[in-house]
């Protein structure tokens, strides 16, 4: 067992109060801002431009023929264990109640068959991400899904609730937690307190809502453990302060923040609906996980941690709950192809390490009968989980290896991106589809990771 007190690393890790203040201020700006020169506007397509072109119709038709869109297993899994679902889910801003930081009702149009304007595979993913509410993964483990881009997972401890990831904003986290307690209190009377918080990684949609569910004073007074991967504060700081303004502008564009929510505009981001643009917070970890395996007993629940730095996030972990035979995969795996390079801008992710961590998880947590993650819906059955992990492992490894092979032959990033396609054994799986990351973008990322931006052309 390795437990590292954050107090021992105060000066080096945080530069403490100043840096946290800067971080929170920066993230608040990021969360509350919108695209330059278009503040408060929504961009919609109108007139003759609304009709899909012949090329679009043909391309979407080809996708429909390639995939088994009648496969309902994902829908069965996404609805499994539903306890309650809110009606007309809108979460107001804490700063201006007339504005919403989250509006799931805007996506009510996503039903039935895919319209001609939308890729049918993406439409299917959007329908799945529309399934919202409080769900029982297994007795003792619950998830709130569809209240933010990411999930909040609640694990019943001896004295309270262990919270895994606290969403993007204080508003969405508070709303999600209150909704969960409203229904879970019937099963677990007099248990509405937070006994521990775990951040799986250093991206804001997994920690930004923390002070919405518990105050800093309560964290300190009640000595609530805050568990995170080593490097968490440093990476959250570097991403949101140093490059925050540039990332914001690009994130607004990448996520289509100002697009109208309709079949001609915004329907989904693959990973979820969209980020919540609300008030963001952070708190200092008290326990850092820096090696595999690390075993902790958290409020009576046994955790086995896998430390996975420089994978989907610079600082990340996954965990296994042996008493439940449940694998908490964080964002190491998800039900879409992830990105090795995010268009909002970030450090390039190492596909080789990433695929290696998935293989490691597959081996050390091979008894898992349940998988749940920081996004999307769970999976049940050891064989299903093993196949899922193998397929995701092979997807990132294939993109890495084939990009490197072409790179060493002298091909440019653009040439590599156009030349690589996933084999059908991988591409036919819905959880490997290019809803969020793409093969073209990821191939360029592999090149950038090894050789940088220069493509070998003297004119450049």
Residue ranges and their predicted role:
Residues 30-31:
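C-terminal motif of bacterial Sec signal peptides marking the signal peptidase cleavage site
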């Amino acid at each position: 067992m390795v437990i590292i007190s954050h107090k021992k690393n105060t000066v080096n890790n945080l530069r403490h109060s100043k840096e946290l203040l800067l971080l929170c201020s920066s993230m608040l700006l990021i969360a509350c801002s919108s695209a330059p020169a278009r503040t408060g506007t929504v961009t919609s397509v109108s007139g003759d431009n609304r009709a899909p072109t012949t090329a679009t119709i043909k391309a979407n038709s080809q996708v429909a023929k390639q995939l088994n869109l009648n496969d309902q297993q994902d829908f069965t899994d996404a609805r499994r264990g539903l306890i309650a679902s809110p009606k007309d889910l809108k979460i107001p801003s804490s700063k201006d109640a007339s504005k919403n930081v989250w509006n799931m009702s805007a996506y009510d149009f996503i039903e039935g068959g895919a319209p001609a304007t939308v890729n049918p595979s993406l439409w299917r993913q959007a329908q799945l991400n529309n399934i919202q509410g409080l769900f029982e993964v297994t007795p003792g483990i619950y998830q709130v899904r569809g209240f933010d881009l990411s999930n909040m997972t609640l694990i019943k401890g001896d004295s309270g609730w262990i919270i895994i990831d606290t969403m993007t904003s204080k508003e969405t986290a508070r709303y999600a937690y209150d909704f969960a307690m409203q229904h879970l209190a019937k099963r677990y009377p007099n248990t509405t307190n937070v006994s521990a918080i775990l951040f799986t990684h250093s991206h804001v949609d997994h920690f930004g809502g923390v002070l919405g569910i518990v105050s800093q004073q309560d964290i300190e007074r009640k000595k609530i453990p805050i568990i995170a991967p080593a490097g968490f504060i440093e990476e959250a700081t570097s991403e949101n302060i140093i490059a925050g303004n540039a990332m914001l502008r690009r994130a607004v564009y990448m996520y289509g923040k100002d697009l109208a929510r309709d079949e001609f505009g915004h329907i989904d981001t693959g990973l979820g609906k969209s980020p919540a643009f609300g008030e963001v917070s952070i708190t200092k970890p008290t326990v850092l996980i820096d090696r595999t395996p690390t075993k902790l007993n958290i409020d009576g629940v046994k955790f086995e941690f896998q430390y996975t730095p420089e994978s989907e996030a610079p600082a990340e972990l996954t965990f296994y709950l042996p008493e439940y035979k449940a694998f908490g995969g964080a964002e190491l795996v998800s039900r879409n192809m992830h990105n090795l390079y995010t268009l909002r801008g970030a450090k390039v992710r190492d596909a080789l390490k990433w695929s290696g961590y998935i293989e490691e998880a597959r081996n050390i947590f091979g008894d898992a009968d349940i998988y749940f993650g920081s996004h999307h819906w769970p999976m049940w059955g050891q064989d299903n989980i093993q196949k899922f992990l193998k397929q995701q492992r092979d997807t990132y490894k294939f993109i890495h290896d084939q990009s490197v092979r072409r790179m060493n032959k002298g091909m440019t990033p653009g040439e590599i991106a156009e030349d690589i396609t996933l084999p059908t054994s991988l591409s036919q799986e819905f959880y490997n589809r290019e809803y969020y990351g793409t093969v073209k973008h990821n191939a360029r990322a592999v090149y950038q990771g090894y050789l940088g931006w220069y493509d070998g052309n003297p004119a450049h």
